[in-house]
Amino acid sequence: MNAITNWMNQQKLGSLLLLAVVLLVVFPLSLDAFRLNMVGKYLTYAFVALGLVMLWGHAGILSLGQGVFFGLGGYCMAMFLKLEASDPESTSIQSTPGIPDFMDWNQLTALPWWWEPFNSLAFALVAVVAVPMLLAFIIGFAMFKRRVGGVYFAIITQAVALVLTVLIIGQQGYTGGVNGITDLKTLNGWDIRTDEARMVLYYVCCALLIACVLLCRWVQSSKLGTLLLAMRDKEDRVRFSGYDVSMFKVFVFCLSAGISAIGGAMFSLQVGFMSPSFVGIVPSIEMVIYAAVGGRMSLVGAIYGALLVNFGKTYFSESAPDLWLFLMAALFIGVTMAFPNGLAGLWEEKIKPWWRSKQIERRAIREGVALAQASYPEPPPPKSGKDVGGLPGGMSGQQA
């Protein structure tokens, strides 16, 4: 609580409140159900951008494989939803009722043992966060204990994304292959395809996103966050001070993986499917772009970056379908070259100092006017004639 209070005292609560108003009030009142569901999908990518702010911006560790954790979280949720949609009554026309349709198409006759626990919603919710964080722990422990970092770590995470994509596509009978897990309909009997359900899921996504922002800010404001910053800037000094740098790196890598996985789970709920196209190298690099455009040092900026990039992608693909890829590339290159620290950096480095200088000028003008008035007071009003020399009728002493 002290960390959050300090953050409020630093006037950063206003940006989060503004974001909450935009997400919870402006968008629902101004967008139709279809567009609002699109915004909800964009916000699921913002979870990955948040994780990258913690990992890349705050700890100095660039990962080009965050799509792995986004996809794992989405697959864990999709597995539960698919099993619920594959009850024996709904799959009675299959040769093996009671299993997902893609398993029946690939001639599986029984549900694999590792699918069985996903019949439980509680297990699925735990697995959404636990499975990606476990994989992040294994990768991070293996790499950071050997002091693998920098570009080498980025390439390794990219390779992990490629390997997992190939694995998912190759095991079509167990994962749905290139099509992924589709036709997700209900959550514990609640139809998630209706406009009302999508509205509820949108608000749930917003609430989880704001909660993750507060969690990340709490970590940043704690002693652990200070050590992460020191590790980013002077890793050797932190190590010589007696701290186990590798375990701090493992922690922040697992944290970013867990946050990204929550976004993947919300994606499966709001969009209704999950496929390997969200796991590979290309989506992972796009997720880095969200943080770069919004500002890799700003939690709220990363969310705006995810919204801006995806709004731009949608707008350009609709208005200029033949040129939208070039327009998006121009947007990415232009923003990153003009504003190396993203849009949040533009605000902090240009707009805010300019606004403060204007406020100082106005204050100086007001104080100057007040000083002039104090130094040169207005002359007193002239006295009436009867008060001059104590004589009546306004007569002077000579006249008397």
Residue spans for each PLM region:
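Transmembrane alpha-helices and adjacent helix-loop boundaries
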Residues: 1-400
